[in-house]
Amino acid sequence: MKIYNTLSGKLEEFVPLEDGKVKMYVCGITPQSEPHIGHAMSYINFDVIRRYLSYKGYRVKYIQNFTDIDDKIIAKANAQGIEPSTLAERNIGVFLDAMAALNITPADYYPRATQEVPKIIEMVSGLIEKGYAYEAGGSVYLRVQKVEGYGKLSHRTLEQMMAGARIEPGEEKEYPMDFALWKATKPGEPSWESPWGLGRPGWHIECSAMSLRYLGEQIDIHGGGQDLIFPHHENEIAQSECFSGVKPFVKYWLHNGLLKLGEEKMSKSLGNLVTIKEALSRYSADALRIFVLSSSYRNPLTYSEEALEAAEKGAERLRQTAARQDNPRLQEINVDVKTYRERFTQYMDNDFNTSAALATIFDLGRELNRIEAEGGKSTQGQELFKELAGILGLSLIIAEPTTSADAAPFIDMLIELRKDLRLAKQYQLADKIRTSLDAAGILLEDSAGGTIWKIKTK
């Protein structure tokens, strides 16, 4: 299996640090507001990567943090007259509900920055002791000029970084690119006791401390959006490797493309958000997955109603195939399940090519539909179809059924009655049965092998 490593800028063979195990850390949200579909894009992609690694037999330990203290959280909380922790926890709850609605596998741990302050202080103290960091005015900064290979992830030199650097008023840095590990307290902000006085953690050190606590000094995969490569992930490498002395901090860096609305990135700062809640009120979770997975995780994706409507139609086709009832009277037809599985695996082994893997599922679905139309069935094909869809996180569950399994015998009886009426050329009565079942949310499909029924989606 080959994956693209941002650090090397090329495809590399995936070999975990420990045989059979994968330690995976994905940067989580800053819960200043409701999650948007840009978040959905990122976490759907990493959910599929995690699911596929599990399918390949790896035991995956997956950590995803919450940056629950931040300048923007503080500003929004102050504007609403509430505590920053209240705002953060409210939005974390909304986020977790959204992830469940999207069928995203929960992380093994969701550490919060505010709960990891002792570990953060330990790391900052260690970096000062080793000469990599210094205190100034109650804040602590990392000396980037002392960091060997600083810029290796973003492939930039310090001179290139300096072009856009500036020192904020009140900062007392030795060098403009030095970044804050600990921020001195300001009036009206949450703060914690530290050896340097009251303050709060810097953004970058939070993830280093949490990954160190839950995954150790080295991890296999670190994921996040491409907008995090610099400065966030670059700075994570610097402080983690300087603190532990172990290199590399991360073996494989994976970054997903960003979601655009027109020509602009979808983001809170631009105010052009579509929340996950809004999207799910119009489209199914399966449709959102198909929309995201129809492109490489590394590519940018443009949000459009047309693309999501097309994805919904595709999801509906897959749901109808998955909902097919087993009919023992139909002839078993062979499907080359080995070839379909090999195709799927070959594509996913090539840097998680979900677009081609998804196309394989649609191809298998079309073959199953053709077999059914010709009066046959393929039990193995149907099982593989559901298995591969599950690896991509597609639930393919008919939404809000208007019937239950208890009604199945009654529906079967009506289908037999309709068959007898048609044989007796009582077409009007036969059609009335079809119409009545349709109104109740039951779709009838006639084929050479007989009539089958399916539950319609909403």
Swiss-Prot record:
GO terms for biological process: cysteinyl-tRNA aminoacylation. GO terms for molecular function: ATP binding; cysteine-tRNA ligase activity; zinc ion binding. The keyword RNA-binding does not apply. The keyword DNA damage does not apply. A motif ('HIGH' region) lies at residues 29-39. SUPFAM superfamilies: Anticodon-binding domain of a subclass of class I aminoacyl-tRNA synthetases, Nucleotidylyl transferase. InterPro entries: Cys-tRNA-ligase, Cys-tRNA-synt_Ia_DALR, Cys-tRNA/MSH_ligase, Rossmann-like_a/b/a_fold, tRNA-synt_1_cat_dom, tRNAsynth_Ia_anticodon-bd. Monomer. Belongs to the class-I aminoacyl-tRNA synthetase family. This is Cysteine--tRNA ligase.
